Amino acid sequence: MAASRVCRLVDEAPEPLWDRLADFSNWRMWLDRVRDSRMAPGPTHSPGATRVVGDPDNPRVHEVLFAVDARTYTLSYGVAPEPVWSVPARNYVATVHLVPLTDRPATVVDWSSRYDCDQGDEQKIGELFVALYHEFIVNLTSPQPA
C-alpha cells in the first residue's frame, strides 16, 4: 500500500476551515479544481454520503464520505471503484485532519491518503496526490466569497 501526505501550517483558526471542509456536499464552493459536484441520493453530511465530482482530469468520480468527526476535526473519504477513475490508484482513502495550535489562531492542515497502485507507479501517483493536496489546502485556506 502506498501513501501520500501534505502538512501545512495556516494562520487561521480551525473552526472556519472545518465549516468548509465538513460540508462534504459543497466542496465545489472552495475547491477550484472541481467544476461540477452533485450529491447522489441519500445522506449528504454523514458517512455514506456520495458525491459525483467532475474536474478537468476526472469527469465523473464518485467520492464517498467514510467518517466525519467535528470533535477531532477529522474527515475521511474515498473513491468508489466504479466508474473507473482515470488515476491508476485503487482502494483510495484520504483523511484530512485539522490540528489547532494552542498559542494562536492557527491550524496544521494534514491531508493524507493510502491507496494501492501497480509497482513502479508509486512515485508518479504520489507526486500527483502531493501536488493536489497542496492545491486543496491553498483553496481551503484562501479567503472565501461572502
Segments predicted by a language model, with ranges:
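Glycine-rich portal/gate segments that line the openings of hydrophobic small-molecule binding cavities
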Residues: 29, 38-87, 143-146
